[in-house]
């Protein structure tokens, strides 16, 4: 391959960059023979500007591997001294899917711009300019977040796949690397059932909006129902499998919607926490939205409505007016269903088994 300095003097590369640097959608079509869907175009256009920060709900069937391959390939070509770091928390199937599309982009590109092979190559980690610049993949594992540290470049792009499952510590490490004038980050994920964490915050408290001009992230919410890659038959099958179109799973995995429980509870007059003492002498506190969500889910399934609809119409009014109703409902919930949300205020006097069902509960 030619040296790095040569590419910046090559009129063929200069002409390519001049034509496509501000229109990656056109580049995908003319260089890779890929007509991006209207949803994929939104993602590309969101991450295209210098120093862009974008967060996207990516339900099933919007063509995420393909669009991530297009973005990674174009970023590497437009900025040879760049680094694209793709962080993924699951199996290597994610990596293989993206790299397969990178190969497709590469093969189409060589037919249109054969000179490009003088500077770049495609390998197991995607498109590379040299040993240190280009694409790389980092397999995220909880408690081993340091494995994604140490990535620096004049042009740096982090793509976080399944962002809802990445720990806050991992995000802290990512942000510590984003020190250059062009540090971009793209978060993609299906919304998780639990409305906590960095991905959730990127769509709410850290979202850039008219009422939040100090926000960081451009927010994109996509629905598989609007995807040209999804058939009605698939949607019908998914709805049947996951409890109907009003089910929480359908709303998250197809409509790309967050449950909305947290916001509804915070905006209501309902108490926000429950404090309780265990028979072993320990004292605990728990967000009341956990109890409210359990109540709303139970009744929503019986009446064929969404959890959020039942929460707003029945659970919140009930729990606001009658605190004893909260306690009585909490008694029906197994400890294992709520233990992860509880915070210990006072340790137990001994190591007796914790008994949530018989604990004294005080609404605050």
Ranges and model annotations:
Residues 2-268:
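Phosphate/NTP-binding elements of NTP-utilizing enzymes
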Residues 284-314:
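Short, flexible N-terminal segments of the mature chain
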Residues 97, 253, 294, 313, ...:
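Generic alpha-helical secondary-structure signal
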Residues 1-2, 269-273, 361-364:
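Short intrinsically disordered terminal tails
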Residues 269-291:
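Short, extreme N-terminal segment that most often corresponds to the first beta-strand
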């Amino acid at each position: 391959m030619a040296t790095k300095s040569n590419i910046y003097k090559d009129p063929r590369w200069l002409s390519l960059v001049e034509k496509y640097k501000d229109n990656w959608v056109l580049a995908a079509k003319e260089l890779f023979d890929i007509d991006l869907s209207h949803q994929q175009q939104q993602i590309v256009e969101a991450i295209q500007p210098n120093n862009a920060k974008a967060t996207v709900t990516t339900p099933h069937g919007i063509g995420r591997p393909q669009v991530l391959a297009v973005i990674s390939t174009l970023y590497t070509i437009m900025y040879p001294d760049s680094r694209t770091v793709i962080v993924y928390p699951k199996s290597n199937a994610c990596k293989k899917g993206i790299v397969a599309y990178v190969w497709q982009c590469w093969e189409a590109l060589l037919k249109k711009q054969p000179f490009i092979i003088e500077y770049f190559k495609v390998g197991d980690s995607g498109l590379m300019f040299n040993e240190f610049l280009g694409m790389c993949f980092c397999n995220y594992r909880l408690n081993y977040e340091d494995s994604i540290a140490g990535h620096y470049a004049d042009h740096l792009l982090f793509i976080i796949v399944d962002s809802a499952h990445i720990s806050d510590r991992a995000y802290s490490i990512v942000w510590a690397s984003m020190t250059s004038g062009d540090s971009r980050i793209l978060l993609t994920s299906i919304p998780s059932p639990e409305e906590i964490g960095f991905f959730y915050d990127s769509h709410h408290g850290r979202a850039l909006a008219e009422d939040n001009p100090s926000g960081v992230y451009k927010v994109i919410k996509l629905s598989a129902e609007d995807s040209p890659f999804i058939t009605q038959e698939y949607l019908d099958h998914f709805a049947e499998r996951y409890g109907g179109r009003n089910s929480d799973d359908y709303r998250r995995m197809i409509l790309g919607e967050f449950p909305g429980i947290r916001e509804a509870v915070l905006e209501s007059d309902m108490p926000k926490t429950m404090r309780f003492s265990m028979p072993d002498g320990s004292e605990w506190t728990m967000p009341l939205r956990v109890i409210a969500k359990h109540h709303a889910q139970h009744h929503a399934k019986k009446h064929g409505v969404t959890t959020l609809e039942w929460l707003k119409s029945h659970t919140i009014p009930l729990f606001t007016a009658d605190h004893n109703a909260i306690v009585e409902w909490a008694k029906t919930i197994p400890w294992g269903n709520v233990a992860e949300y509880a915070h210990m205020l006072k340790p137990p006097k001994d190591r007796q088994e914790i008994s949530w069902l018989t604990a004294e509960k005080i609404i605050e």
